[in-house]
């Protein structure tokens, strides 16, 4: 059974929520499913906790991202 964790989803250039991200707590598949339910296919990447920390530490200074929504499947939003 896959362990639950926080997943971060980003939006790409030219998308409605460009420069923002969503955090969802769940398994890889359940978090992805929730993201599709909320935003369809209009988002860019899915990161696990380690990948997101790595991206944040290497992200160019001119790329600013803001939290749009945080969803805990067990507690919902």
Residue ranges and their predicted role:
Residues 16-30:
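A short, exposed loop/beta-hairpin motif centered on an aromatic-Gly-Thr core
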Residues 38-77:
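Short, mixed-charge low-complexity intrinsically disordered segments
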Residues 10-12, 29, 73:
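Serine/threonine-rich, low-complexity intrinsically disordered segments
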Residues 2-19:
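Short aromatic-glycine-(Arg/Gly/Cys) micro-motifs in beta-strand/loop hairpins
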Residues 26-28, 32, 52, 64:
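A general, composition-driven signal for non-globular sequence regions
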């Amino acid at each position: 059974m896959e362990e639950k964790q926080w997943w971060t989803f980003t939006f790409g250039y030219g998308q409605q929520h460009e420069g923002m991200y969503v955090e969802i707590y769940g398994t890889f598949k359940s978090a992805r499913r929730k993201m599709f339910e909320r935003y369809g296919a209009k988002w860019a990447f899915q990161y696990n906790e380690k990948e997101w920390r790595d991206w944040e530490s290497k992200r160019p200074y001119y790329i600013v991202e803001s939290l749009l929504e945080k969803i805990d499947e067990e507690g919902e939003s």
